[in-house]
Amino acid sequence: MKEEHATCGRISPKEKLQELVTSPRPHEYLDVNALPETWDWRNINGTNYLSWSRNQHIPTYCGSCWAHGPTSSLADRINIVRNRTWPDMTLSPQVIVNCQAGGSCNGGNPAEVYVYANRHGIPEETCQAYVAKNPDHFSCSDIQ
């Protein structure tokens, strides 16, 4: 991979990850005793708000769980805010593998995915389908 593509969105090891909280967190304002005993976003009055499960090793082996977890988590939050309206939100972990440079098919840092999302956004899966491999050549400016 060319150097110009290798640093696309990557956080320097010297740069400290900062907290990106912009609103009060639930534990700061909720009374824990008022919470229900159980809660499952897969079944809220018959509605499943969570994104579908994916296999990071299809079509080939790729250790990209570090990209799949955060993109699914963010997509779930979008589906919840949108009250699961169609179309379902599915964010592209392949863009993260291609651009974020906080990892590859050999592993990575999920915390950097959230920083990348905050700085650049993450497009939907239709922008860059998951191919389970490191890019041979890919320009992140193609998707932004």
Regions flagged by a language model, labelled:
Residues 1-144:
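Catalytic-core signature of thiol
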